[in-house]
Curated annotation (Swiss-Prot):
Keywords: Nucleotide-binding. The lineage of its organism: Bacteria, Pseudomonadati, Elusimicrobiota, Endomicrobiia, Endomicrobiales. It comes from Endomicrobium trichonymphae. GO terms for cellular component: cytosol. The keyword Oxidoreductase does not apply. Belongs to the YajQ family. Gene3D superfamilies: 3.30.70.860, YajQ-like, domain 2 (3.30.70.990). GO terms for molecular function: nucleotide binding. HAMAP family: YajQ. This is Nucleotide-binding protein TGRD_519. Coiled coil: none annotated.
């Protein structure tokens, strides 16, 4: 029997599901009555991991966000992975807003998460390893406590628990 157990904490986004969600949002946009005769659009830049929303006015921008977030939810992609930037004026009075798709734990977020695990007083070790955090313990129960603790927190990124050993 192993004397140490571990798992990894990651924050990854399935880009295929994001692509599917954006395509479904485009289809809904084309069929919605309130968007008839509108130049509103949703564009995905896979290379830069950015989604660009263009709308006629504030109301339609809010509706575009609702459509996109609804499709993300249906495809089981966390809305927490979207980081909306500031709205800006586009051509001919239109409004443009960019949403960056966040994938991976930055070093700041990893340190913050590691500190949260240490502050929980559960007897585990948290090691930052690039874009993931490895949590090690001698008891499986402690690892399960850490997972339960992190799930009940409202962390600003979607967290997945992988590589159980």
């Amino acid at each position: 029997m192993a004397d140490k157990f571990s798992f990894d904490i990651v924050s990854e986004v399935n880009m295929m599901e994001v692509d599917n969600a954006v395509n479904q949002a485009r289809k809904e946009l084309a069929n919605r009555f309130d968007f008839k005769d509108s130049k509103s659009s949703i564009e995905l830049n896979k290379k830069d991991k950015k989604i660009t929303l263009i709308a006629d006015n504030e109301y339609k921008m809010k509706a575009l966000k609702d459509i996109l977030e609804g499709r993300f939810a249906k495809r089981n992609v966390s809305i927490k992975s979207l980081d909306y930037k500031v709205q800006e004026n586009a051509f001919e009075g239109y409004i443009r807003q960019t949403a960056e798709i966040i994938s991976g734990l930055s070093s700041d977020r990893a340190k913050e998460l590691s500190k949260l695990i240490r502050d929980s007083k559960i007897k585990v070790q948290a090691q930052i390893d690039g874009t993931k955090i490895k949590v090690i313990s001698t008891k499986k129960d402690d690892l399960q406590l850490v997972i339960a603790y992190l799930k009940q927190l409202s962390f600003p990124l979607p967290l997945q628990f992988t590589n159980y050993r």
